[in-house]
């Protein structure tokens, strides 16, 4: 049964309450598709009323933006550790392997960013969206800087271009390579099997080809 929380008074209490709600939403993410997770479902999982959720998040989309930041932070931290081991190697194959494997290991991050612009960046205030983008792009800049320390033969603009392509490839490839059951069944037909998308292979190839193209412009 849902319970109505006593209103949090201190900043610490508010932070703890919002984290509890985010944890509930995160648990649901491991069990259900994003489009099936409603604010009512999150409230039930957190054992609170829907009205209580609105005290900490202005909408479902706002809540998922905060989850995206958490997932982005985890992806970034793992990625930075792995990239430090490759500094100044200029090895396109290794950096592609690291970017692909780290993304595959952080499935929640890939799922969330695949619907970020089409779903989560709607029904939220300009203030919430601005704060989100500032934090999100700060995470990406850390990754860009780390990639630049590996691919020292590329300039900053080229590294930004590489990571922009990588990011949007993840956004597009993830849903295409993880179709809904109906599409999966259709792709099992022999005449449609060649439309299957291999996330790992496609992303890795894109990264390597992009690096090669950027290097050719240097020469």
Model-derived regions, located:
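Hydrophobic alpha-helical connector segments
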Residues: 66, 81-109, 162-166
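Alpha-helical structural segments
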Residues: 16, 20-27, 45, 62-85, ...
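C-terminal peripheral helix-coil segments that are non-catalytic and often amphipathic
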Residues: 2-5, 138-153, 169-219
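Basic, helix-initiating cap at the start of DNA-binding domains
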Residues: 1-33, 40-41, 45, 84-87
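Amphipathic alpha-helical interaction segments
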Residues: 20, 41, 94-98, 161-168, ...
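Membrane-interface starts of transmembrane alpha-helices
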Residues: 151, 155-163
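Amphipathic alpha-helical segments used for helix-helix packing
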Residues: 105-127, 181-186
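Helix-turn-helix
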Residues: 35-62, 66
């Amino acid at each position: 049964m849902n319970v109505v929380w006593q209103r949090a008074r201190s900043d610490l209490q508010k932070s703890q309450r919002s984290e509890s709600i985010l944890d509930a939403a995160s648990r649901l993410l491991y069990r259900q598709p994003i489009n099936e997770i409603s604010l009512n479902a999150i409230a039930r999982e957190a054992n609170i009323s829907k009205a209580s959720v609105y005290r900490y998040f202005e909408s479902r989309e706002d809540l998922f933006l905060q989850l995206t930041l958490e997932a982005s932070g985890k992806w970034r931290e793992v990625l930075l550790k792995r990239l430090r081991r490759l500094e100044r190697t200029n090895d396109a194959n290794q950096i592609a392997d690291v970017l692909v494997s780290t993304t595959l290991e952080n499935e929640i991050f890939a799922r969330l960013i695949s619907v970020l612009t089409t779903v989560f960046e709607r029904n939220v205030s300009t203030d919430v969206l601005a704060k989100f983008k500032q934090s999100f792009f700060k995470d990406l800049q850390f990754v860009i800087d780390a990639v630049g320390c590996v691919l020292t033969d590329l300039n900053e603009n080229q590294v930004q271009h590489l990571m922009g392509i990588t990011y949007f490839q993840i956004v597009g490839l993830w849903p295409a390579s993880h179709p809904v059951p109906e599409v999966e069944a259709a792709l099992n037909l022999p005449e449609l099997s060649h439309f299957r998308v291999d996330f790992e292979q496609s992303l890795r190839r894109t990264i390597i080809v992009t690096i090669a193209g950027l290097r050719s412009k240097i020469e």
